[in-house]
Amino acid sequence: MAGFGAAPDFNEGSKINASKNQQDEGKMFIGGLSWDTSKKDLTEYLSRFGEVLDCTIKTDPVTGRSRGFGFVLFKDAVSVDKVLETNEHKLDGKLIDPKRAKALKGKEPPKKVFVGGLSPETTEEQIKQYFGGFGEIENIELPIDTKTNERRGFCFVTYTGEEPVKKLLESRFHQIGTGKCEIKAAQPKEVYRQQQQKQQRGGRGAVTGRGGTRGRGRGQGWNQGYNNYYDQNYGGYGNNGSYGDQDYNSYSGYDYSGYSYGYNPGYTEYSGQQSTYGKARGGGNHQNNYQPY
């Protein structure tokens, strides 16, 4: 067991993301966080209940501010029980609200990944060679810009099973050819559309124009705008939102849509709007009141 104050060695969120859409008894959702609470603060607090393998706090993709919730992965499921057995948790002057993280029922594990920031100099053979090292490839899609007739700065790789995807998602960035690419699980376009509709009802709408200018994509025309690929007819797939982390109405595989804390309006769905959760609470201990938990 990690002692209080110990910090686990991991790429933030990598282990949590690796098991999206799958039930993991060691995983927890942590709501009600102060906007000032850091990943280190949360890790140190929860380490008193058991060894923490991974921890991430979700932030607004535009402002970079904490959205007042996060996820933690314990090594042992018994640590989750210990957390839930404690009646009250207080961190940075706020009562926080830990819950078991439950995967969406009936959602199949992803077999397809989105590869963003792909240099046009990277050949199809290089792509096959790299991704083939993770498992058997069923298909590779290399979208072409219909206006320029040139390859776009992203691609899709579909595997015959879900295990290669889990391995890939353990790291967010991968060196492919001469460039550093970002890997995300691909989602069907209809799923993305539903998420965008919830975002717009929440008052923000879609966040656009960010994906193509992040990291190595900055200033490179071939890498501009691949955040919007879901609006093109490229196999009907999206990538969890506008190429960012604003999509948490179902947290890309965890059933938190309609998760109402009974505190403030604006935190009933994690669809990208700035959370008001953390500014005020309605009080009380709500250990068993939330669905779909």
UniProtKB/Swiss-Prot annotation:
It is found in: Nucleus; Cytoplasm. GO terms for molecular function: DNA binding; poly(A) binding; poly(G) binding; RNA binding. Residues 202-222 have a biased composition (Gly residues). InterPro entries: hnRPDL_RRM1 (IPR034847), Nucleotide-bd_a/b_plait_sf (IPR012677), RBD_domain_sf (IPR035979), RRM_dom (IPR000504). CDD domains: RRM1_hnRPDL. Gene3D superfamilies: 3.30.70.330. Its main location: nucleus. GO terms for cellular component: chromatin; cytoplasm; nucleoplasm. Keywords: Cytoplasm, DNA-binding, Methylation, Nucleus, Repeat, RNA-binding, Transcription, Transcription regulation. Pfam families: RRM_1 (PF00076). This is Heterogeneous nuclear ribonucleoprotein D-like-A. It comes from Xenopus laevis (African clawed frog). The gene is hnrnpdl-a.
